[in-house]
Regions:
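Hydrophobic h-region of N-terminal signal peptides that target proteins for export
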Residues: 11-20
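Bacterial N-terminal signal peptides that target proteins for export
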Residues: 1-7
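Structural micro-motif
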Residues: 124-128
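Structural microenvironment flanking redox-active thiols in thiol-disulfide oxidoreductases
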Residues: 58-60, 66-122
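A short beta-strand-turn-helix
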Residues: 32-61
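Thiol/disulfide oxidoreductase modules built on the thioredoxin-like
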Residues: 131-135
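Short, flexible, glycine/charge-rich loop motifs used to bind or transfer phosphoryl groups or to couple energy/partner
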Residues: 22, 51-54, 86-87
Length: 135
């Protein structure tokens, strides 16, 4: 076998050995926490942040998305968000949790990303927005 064939075969088989997650059917997902910013809280038109941990996600069906703090990432998820909105799911049994990685934003745009999240929080106060500035 030539070096080229060995390299090609390795490149084809290597992704099969990698695992993007370690989820197991019937088991809880290991909790993660975000302490640098955390959950965006709106209280009487004032915004603040509190430490967030996924162990708090009990009692509701959820869609959890972890996206980059870029417009392109928001656009890629727009179809999903529109489908969720049009489904008119009950807020007492369903919640969307969005973790935004502002570390993956265009340098200097973190302030604009947070401003956009604040606008969305005002529009959809029942949704959770988590700011992760450490990636």
């Amino acid at each position: 076998m030539t070096l080229r064939k060995i390299l090609a075969l390795t490149c084809l088989l290597l992704p099969m050995m990698a695992s993007a997650h370690q989820f197991e059917t019937g088991q809880r997902v290991p909790p993660i926490g975000i302490t640098d910013r955390g959950e965006l809280v709106l209280d009487k038109d004032q915004f603040s942040y509190k430490t967030w941990n996924s162990a708090q996600l009990v009692g509701k069906v959820r869609v959890l998305q972890h996206i980059a703090g870029r417009t392109s990432a928001k656009e890629k998820n727009a179809t999903l968000i529109e489908a969720i909105k049009s489904a008119k799911l009950p807020h007492d049994r369903y919640q969307t949790t969005t973790i935004v990685n502002t570390d993956d934003a265009i340098p200097g745009s973190g302030m604009f990303v947070r401003s956009s999240l604040e606008s969305n929080k005002k529009l959809y106060p029942w949704s959770q927005f988590i700011v992760d500035s450490n990636g």
